[in-house]
Amino acid sequence: MIKITFPDGNFREYEAGITGWDIAGSISPRLQQDVLAAGVNGQVWDLHRPINEDAEVKLFKWDDAEGKHAFWHSSAHLMAEALEELYPGIKFGIGPAIENGFYYDVDPGEGISIKDADLPAIEKRMQDLAARKETIIRRDIAKADALRMFGDKDDQYKVELISELADGTITTYTQGGFTDLCRGPHLPNTGYIKAIKLLSVAGAYWRGDEKRKQLTRIYGISFPKKKMLDEYLELLEEAKKRDHRKIGKELELFAFSQNVGAGLPLWLPRGTQLRLRLEDFLKQIQKHFGYQQVITPHIGNKNLYITSGHYAKYGQDSFRPINTPQEGEEFMLKPMNCPHHCEIFKITPHSYRDLPIRLAEFGTVYRYEQSGELHGLTRVRGFTQDDAHLFCRPDQLKEEFCKVMDIIFIIFKALDFKNFEAQISLRDKVNREKYIGSEENWERAERAIIEACEEKGLPAVIEYGEAAFYGPKLDFMVKDALGRRWQLGTIQVDYNLPERFDLEYTGEDNKKHRPVMIHRAPFGSMERFVAVLIEHTAGKFPLWLTPDQVVVLPVSERFNEYAHRVAKELNQRDIRVQVDDRNEKVGRKIRDNELKRIPYMLIVGENESREEEVSVRKQGEGDMGIMKITTFAELIEKEVDDMISAWRKDYQN
């Protein structure tokens, strides 16, 4: 008999060779119906894989990320099986599960292309194969046999992948007449897949290398129920309406120019106003928390990034070094701000009394992204991080960590991100040798993060083995208005850079000590954060943040002068206002400015100009009646003051 321990600490004994499927059935028929994969001692297994020794077991359903992963991974194989039947001789690259669905990179063959118009036929074949409920079989075979198998099919991509694996056994999965190289896990059979939608076709270079062949990437998604697919497709349609690229163009926030270069956004006047207000908002909070603003160059000597380790990590993702013709020095576009901040810390000797030192910068950094990977503001080649680096004593780590968490909470509240969760990334429990820093420092840092989350009442998932080699971290994932998860806000403890840059302070014992470094970026990057904010709000920004708070609409040209007088009076009270004095009917002006998401519209005509009044319309609410100009101005000022006071109160308490 073997002992199976469950997540709640309870255990049962079973015959050796029991499977996750059998364990689920021993608990309840409903669980056996819903379970998709099994966690065995921290690894995700197929449900029908035998368990032959004592183990900790967790059963994963659709609501678990591991369950979805197995489901979508099997769906990728189902698509590959359909493609092999429809396109004889097709070659396969990789086909993973991703956050929302799956894809497969394929080479259809010389002169053959797969386009969006072909997706319905592929989808139909997948549905037919799923209906057969083909058993998915896992096999362990020798590496030589795997090379022979895929070599006989002339599948050079699989042969290349297998050649790079260590000698020994290779895992394959078979369903029907299709076999694929794969670690798994997978569903028991294809019948679990009830609803399928292939979404799009794109190009992708083999192994991400622009010098290699461009393959065809087919994206799809699948569900265990048709109703789930219908709901997802509705969500997808709403997401298209909220696409930050579409709204950014409509609101004239940002643009791209091929003459400037792909992945290099141009911030237009209205977008610049929005971004600067976000920056000012964070600067006010940082000032309260004792941060000092710094500015560093856009380039740095290559040796700086060799010292920091960023050249080794980001060298392939960086633009080529800039060579000075006379001195022969090499400079790089800055890939990260932290090495520069370390150099600022080193300029002045520090005592233990000086710490913590908090350096903040809206610093622009540059990474080379392949053109096919660029996407609006969320994936660019030049972006500005709301970066800060804190240098503190080990005994100050927890307190400083809590304060950074407070800053992130204030930002999320002010911008209406109500639903968020956190992940604590800690060391691998077993392989400790791959981490730098003393055991004592690591334990202190990990304990500080866990206790900080407990003190703040923040539920957090702990992931072992996810920490960087130089320290543990806390990541925040927010859910937007459509329920999509975005990673926003990171707090990272770092023992590496203080060592690399030989940072030190004089302790109370008059000896030299290493500071602990904290990296933090609540927004992450301004570009990506603005993209998420646009899609979360559908471009309807809070009144304190929106580029234009008011637009004045004269009903005819006769009242343009009065409209500009109203605008001038509001401008004098720091209310952001525009005048739409186009020679158009007022109904057209109202519709156009509704699309621009301007919160308030003031309509002025004969009566309003005579009485020194305005007719007020609020975005999404309609007519608010006639008001004196001063009354309306006071209404705006109070609404903004109430919003600002709410988040100021949070950090002043």
UniProtKB/Swiss-Prot annotation:
MF term (GO), any: ATP binding
Catalytic: annotated segments: 243-542
Enzyme superclass (EC): ligase
GO biological process, one term: threonyl-tRNA aminoacylation
Ranges for domain TGS: 1-61
EC nos: 6.1.1.3
GO cellular component: cytoplasm
Cofactor: binding details: Binds 1 zinc ion per subunit.
Gene3D superfamilies assigned to the protein according to its UniProt record, in alphabetical order: 3.10.20.30, 3.30.54.20, Anticodon-binding domain, Bira Bifunctional Protein, Domain 2, Threonyl-trna Synthetase, Chain A, domain 2
Keywords attached to this entry: Aminoacyl-tRNA synthetase, ATP-binding, Cytoplasm, Ligase, Metal-binding, Nucleotide-binding, Protein biosynthesis, RNA-binding, tRNA-binding, Zinc
Residues at which Zn(2+) binds: C338, H389, H519
This protein's record includes keyword Hydrolase: no
CDD domains reported for this sequence: TGS_ThrRS, ThrRS_anticodon, ThrRS_core
InterPro entries referenced in this protein's UniProt entry, alphabetically: aa-tRNA-synt_IIb, aa-tRNA-synth_II, aa-tRNA-synth_II/BPL/LPL, Anticodon-bd, Anticodon-bd_dom_sf, Beta-grasp_dom_sf, TGS, TGS-like
Reaction(s) catalysed (UniProt annotation): tRNA(Thr) + L-threonine + ATP = L-threonyl-tRNA(Thr) + AMP + diphosphate + H(+)
Cell compartment(s), UniProt: Cytoplasm
Domain of life: Bacteria
Quaternary context: Homodimer.
Family to which this protein belongs: Belongs to the class-II aminoacyl-tRNA synthetase family.
Alphabetized HAMAP family for the sequence: Thr_tRNA_synth
Functional summary from the UniProt entry: Catalyzes the attachment of threonine to tRNA(Thr) in a two-step reaction: L-threonine is first activated by ATP to form Thr-AMP and then transferred to the acceptor end of tRNA(Thr). Also edits incorrectly charged L-seryl-tRNA(Thr).
The protein, known as: Threonine--tRNA ligase
Organism: Porphyromonas gingivalis (strain ATCC 33277 / DSM 20709 / CIP 103683 / JCM 12257 / NCTC 11834 / 2561)
Lineage, broadest ranks: Bacteria, Pseudomonadati, Bacteroidota, Bacteroidia, Bacteroidales
